Amino acid sequence: MXYLPGPQQQAFKELQGL
């Protein structure tokens, strides 16, 4: 995935943290 800046990036980071 690419890099997603903004609030989407935070949600994506939580998905990877699972």
Curated annotation (Swiss-Prot):
Main site of residence?
Answer: endoplasmic reticulum
Catalytic activity line of the entry: an organic molecule + reduced [NADPH--hemoprotein reductase] + O2 = an alcohol + oxidized [NADPH--hemoprotein reductase] + H2O + H(+)
Which residues does UniProt call coiled coil? none
Topology within the bilayer: Peripheral membrane protein
Q: Which GO terms describe its molecular function?
A: metal ion binding; oxidoreductase activity, acting on paired donors, with incorporation or reduction of molecular oxygen, reduced flavin or flavoprotein as one donor, and incorporation of one atom of oxygen
Entry EC number(s) = 1.14.14.1
Q: What are its GO biological-process terms?
A: sensory perception of smell
**Swiss-Prot/TrEMBL cofactor(s):** heme
Listed A to Z, the keywords are:
Endoplasmic reticulum, Heme, Iron, Membrane, Metal-binding, Microsome, Monooxygenase, Olfaction, Oxidoreductase, Sensory transduction
- What cellular component terms from Gene Ontology apply here? endoplasmic reticulum membrane
Is Secreted among the key words of this record? Answer: no
Q: Where in the cell is it found?
A: Endoplasmic reticulum membrane; Microsome membrane
What job does the chain carry out?
A: Cytochromes P450 are a group of heme-thiolate monooxygenases. In liver microsomes, this enzyme is involved in an NADPH-dependent electron transport pathway. It oxidizes a variety of structurally unrelated compounds, including steroids, fatty acids, and xenobiotics.
Q: State what protein this is by name.
A: Cytochrome P450 2A
The lineage, from the top, is: Eukaryota, Metazoa, Chordata, Craniata, Vertebrata
